[in-house]
Curated annotation (Swiss-Prot):
Entry's EC annotation: 3.5.4.28, 3.5.4.31
Function text: Catalyzes the deamination of 5-methylthioadenosine and S-adenosyl-L-homocysteine into 5-methylthioinosine and S-inosyl-L-homocysteine, respectively. Is also able to deaminate adenosine.
Keywords for the protein's UniProt record, in alphabetical order: Hydrolase, Metal-binding, Zinc
Native source organism of the sequence: Haloarcula marismortui (strain ATCC 43049 / DSM 3752 / JCM 8966 / VKM B-1809)
GO MF annotation, one: metal ion binding
Transmembrane segments: none
Protein's recorded name: 5-methylthioadenosine/S-adenosylhomocysteine deaminase
GN (gene name): mtaD
EC category: hydrolase
Pfam family, one: Amidohydro_1
Gene3D superfamilies: Metal-dependent hydrolases, Urease, subunit C, domain 1
Family named by the database record: Belongs to the metallo-dependent hydrolases superfamily. MTA/SAH deaminase family.
Cofactor: Zn(2+)
Length: 432
């Protein structure tokens, strides 16, 4: 058995206490074998965690990883105008090679900032799955289906592809890839199609992921057309259950919060994107108080504009307090749990905690920095002070993805150069 020892540091335990300990992981099973006193464990390989904090690998619960190619392309617009005037015209020109290049860039960015698992919505999912496999990460992937603006044949083709991709790729990358059926949103997929295809997904035991209640402009048309709130409409169709998680959930009322809790439907909160697009402030503390599982996602780099989950934790805590008008709301420990254990629960992975038997997904934070001094409360630092660039090592499934800030699973320079070339070509094609 090949074992990796993470030694010399402090460890964040599942109850959010911090203790000095070593962590031993099996590189055969990909699990944590032991967490014990310093000097009591031995491994075949070691990672030095001196002056560091060992934390669970972060979980990006909602993103569009290949949209790194659109980073900085269009800013300072509301969601609908941004999508229709800038994003969708460029996305129409995307090739499979573009998406692979953008995905690799995004995965490198995540590895460098301690993220080990992600939930992605996009196209050319086989390319993204291959990139995830090479990266050694975990992911929930799916093909995002849209029916608006399409004839019946094209609409059905989209939804069939979403089902087929989910069936085909589930369990890829030695089980590190899971899949979801992905109708884009309640306003971009017609009711007749949802009523036909959602039961097929449920019959195949596929989880479901979609955008919901992101902006007021998504809520009003559904209320006007169907006479009920969006999540009540979704529940009527059969979309809400314990294997469904929605992205955003910004404009939800009390009845919808109760409905999410009753059905076991989770929420991927994307605070930076919601702020940048002026979509609104999600009532995260109300969701948590009701028992809803809430994870954190970056959304795409085009609306964020990075994939740093530490930035996202800080944003989630800040905007959560504003939304609740309560400085004690969405506290430091809560956002750390949202970015780790809660995110893992949404995605269905046995990770998000440093504990014997859990997936060996972890990151080591270098605490030897001015902005992390003094160390009164390391959980506070994780939520409010740590940057992605403070990550020293990243491990997923027991394998070292980054050692001493050097990514080992990709040629980072080549990935960056290739992504830049594809981005330039993409924008040029879209402008023709």
């Amino acid at each position: 058995m090949s074992e990796l020892l993470v030694t010399g540091g402090q460890v964040l335990r599942p109850d959010l206490t911090v203790e000095r300990a070593d962590v031993l992981v099996s590189q055969d099973s990909g699990d944590i074998v032991a967490v014990d006193d310093p000097g009591t464990l031995d491994g075949d390989d070691e990672l030095d965690a001196s002056d560091g904090l060992v934390i669970p690998g972060l979980v990006n619960a909602h993103t569009h990883v290949a949209m790194t190619l659109l980073r900085g392309l269009a800013d300072d617009k509301p969601l609908d105008a941004w999508l229709q005037e800038d994003v969708w015209p460029v996305e129409a020109e995307l090739t499979a090679d573009d998406i692979r290049a953008g995905a690799e860039l995004g995965l490198v960015e995540m590895i460098r900032s301690g993220t080990t698992a992600l939930s992605d919505m996009y196209f050319e999912v086989e390319e993204i799955a291959d990139a995830v496999d090479q990266a050694g990460m975990r992911a929930v992937l799916g093909f995002t289906a849209v029916t608006v603006g399409k004839d019946d044949e094209a609409a059905r083709s989209d939804l069939e592809e979403s089902l087929d991709v989910a069936r085909k790729l589930d369990g890829a990358a030695d089980g590190r890839v899971r899949t979801t059926f992905q109708p884009h949103s309640l306003t971009t997929v017609g009711e007749e199609y949802l009523r036909e295809f959602v039961p097929q997904a449920l019959e195949d035991d596929l989880s479901i992921h979609l955008h919901a209640n992101e902006t007021r402009d998504e809520v009003t048309p559904i209320v006007d057309e169907h006479g009920q709130r969006p999540l009540a409409y979704a529940d009527n169709i059969g979309l809400l259950d314990g294997d469904t998680y929605v992205a955003h959930g910004v404009h939800v009322d009390d009845s919808e919060i109760d409905l999410l809790a009753e059905t076991g439907t989770g929420v991927a909160h994307c605070p930076a994107s919601n702020m940048k697009l002026a979509s609104g402030m999600a009532p995260v503390q109300d969701l948590l108080d009701a028992g809803v599982t809430v994870g954190i996602g970056t959304d795409g780099a085009a609306s964020n504009n990075d994939l740093d989950m530490f930035d996202e934790m800080r944003d989630a805590a800040m905007i959560g307090k504003l939304a609740a008008d309560d400085a004690s709301a969405v506290d430091a420990g809560t956002v750390v749990e949202m970015a780790t254990a809660n995110g893992a629960a949404l995605l269905g992975f046995d990770s998000g905690r440093i504990e014997t038997g859990a997936n060996a997904d972890l990151a080591v934070i270098d605490l030897d920095a001015p902005h992390l001094t003094p160390a009164h409360d390391l959980v506070s630092h994780l939520a409010y002070a740590v940057h992605g660039s403070d990550v020293r090592h990243t491990v997923c499934d027991g394998e070292v993805l980054m050692r001493d800030r050097t990514v080992e699973v990709f040629d980072e320079q080549a990935v960056r150069e290739r992504a830049s070339e594809h981005a330039a070509s993409l924008v040029e094609r879209a402008g023709d």
